[in-house]
Amino acid sequence: MAFNTAMASTSPAAANDVLREHIGLRRSLSGQDLVLKGGGIRRSSSDNHLCCRSGNNNNRILAVSVRPGMKTSRSVGVFSFQISSSIIPSPIKTLLFETDTSQDEQESDEIEIETEPNLDGAKKANWVERLLEIRRQWKREQKTESGNSDVAEESVDVTCGCEEEEGCIANYGSVNGDWGRESFSRLLVKVSWSEAKKLSQLAYLCNLAYTIPEIKGEDLRRNYGLKFVTSSLEKKAKAAILREKLEQDPTHVPVITSPDLESEKQSQRSASSSASAYKIAASAASYIHSCKEYDLSEPIYKSAAAAQAAASTMTAVVAAGEEEKLEAARELQSLQSSPCEWFVCDDPNTYTRCFVIQGSDSLASWKANLFFEPTKFEDTDVLVHRGIYEAAKGIYEQFLPEITEHLSRHGDRAKFQFTGHSLGGSLSLIVNLMLISRGLVSSEAMKSVVTFGSPFVFCGGEKILAELGLDESHVHCVMMHRDIVPRAFSCNYPDHVALVLKRLNGSFRTHPCLNKNKLLYSPMGKVYILQPSESVSPTHPWLPPGNALYILENSNEGYSPTALRAFLNRPHPLETLSQRAAYGSEGSVLRDHDSKNYVKAVNGVLRQHTKLIVRKARIQRRSVWPVLTSAGRGLNESLTTAEEIMTRV
């Protein structure tokens, strides 16, 4: 570990002073790690360094500006996007679970930070502001709580939140059940060749959405008979040109902003100093120091550490105030800050317009994913992921011109197809249901929504399908056998994580899915389970070996909703994140969620179908050929006999 020069040169007496620091940090004898008295902190190699320096009367925590490089590992959470842990330092992650007020009495202590000049200022300000907001939130809560209140004894409203006369929307079943390969495999049905071919085409389009600038209309027409229409990038370019023309127009009246107001806002941003954020780091260190069960000898990738790493990023957004959330919602709905890009193509033969939405690939998509508190969908009682719903509202407005144009051109013959990978699939589903619920497009004109590796975002989605006159076949959810993203919101949430969510945000206190089923959002629609070849990813213990695409058929005898829930918890996302092999460009998280691997796996299933058809054709040809040859010999003999009779006559 890189130490500050002042610390490296301290005398033994000074070292003893360091050990007596009230923040609980001491320097290890080896000089390689920074550990805690009675417990210890092990620094993740991707986090900022925290150093303690003793002065005359100053207690300081320094963040060393060296950024350790880790070529083969990146910070990967339960989502498909990648978040650098430099945005949320490791010690602070622990604070996001529990608070410690012991450091509040030492607000006057001087805290310094050496900033990294190569970091983007906006990114640094982002996590600092979030942390300060959490700190203010907790201070307000602590004032209302008794001084010696315990987390386990905190009064939390755990009512379902559903109207009793209407029934609960969270009837999903428990995770309990004795499921294994034999019992679970009986519920699986292999998809047909025609359906696999359709899914292969849509998976290809979803993968293409990540490289929209490289799309060639000729390739789409030649390979799939599709015509490229437009994309979000073209819309943004046109909007930029129009805005530039308006600015150059002498008759255009510009929006006047007050310089004084702007400077005041800037000074307020500066006031949110990084020093205050590192006070939180000191509190975090003190909290970990007080945890006697924390064992430094245990691997850092244990499930508990993985749980903290996964939930800390979510907590930062959950704790934000309503004003900040409304501002984030407005950003998600704007064209320029939309979380996902998209493109549109037509199938002239079937009058179908296909909308393909990209998955998580930007900071805005990170916001949409983590802004995951429940809210009502379209003035109904059905709850939906708020961040993705807000983003879908913006994409809905962007799609409207293309939808109305297609309807006006083809009338009743017009059809619409929505698809997407990861976050894009969830957005596709919400936009699709918004169009139907608002009466702009009839349900008959909508083809089934197809998602690939997308998180479930509805609590009680079956209810909204029933209200719109749809059945579960309207939604086709394709998930890789070990993909962590579809499991992210639908796995079993540990009690301590659920408690933190309820403490920080009141909407989770009456969230039916969380209170009744210990999950955030329940699965909906038909679930397709895609297993690649063993050379790509290990076989799931509940699936037959080999590359295959199955439908989890609920009409099979012995089916229960607990089967799907049990599958979504095996492996549990925290179990996946607890493994070293989960991280990095070659890690299992990226491997089992990559859109390219979805395309390869579905195409592998198609090749198996093709080989099987060819093999059957060969067998049939070989079995029919002797019959044809024998029939030919009999025909020749009959012709010869007829000739003899005729010559005799």
Curated annotation (Swiss-Prot):
Enzyme class: hydrolase
Domain of life assignment: Eukaryota
Chloroplast is among the record's keywords: yes
Presequence positions on this chain: 1-67
Principal localisation: plastid
Cell compartments where the protein resides: Plastid, Chloroplast thylakoid membrane
Catalytic activity reported: a 1,2-diacyl-sn-glycero-3-phosphocholine + H2O = a 2-acyl-sn-glycero-3-phosphocholine + a fatty acid + H(+); a 1,2-diacyl-3-O-(beta-D-galactosyl)-sn-glycerol + 2 H2O = 3-beta-D-galactosyl-sn-glycerol + 2 a fatty acid + 2 H(+)
An annotated GO cellular component: chloroplast thylakoid membrane
SUPFAM superfamilies: alpha/beta-Hydrolases
Consequence of gene loss (knockout): Reduced levels of oil seeds and delay in seed germination.
Active site positions: 422 (acyl-ester intermediate), 483 (charge relay system), 593 (charge relay system)
GO molecular function: galactolipase activity; phospholipase A1 activity
InterPro entries: AB_hydrolase_fold, Fungal_lipase-type, PLIP1/2/3
Gene3D superfamilies: alpha/beta hydrolase (3.40.50.1820)
Name of the protein: Phospholipase A1 PLIP1, chloroplastic
Organism (species): Arabidopsis thaliana
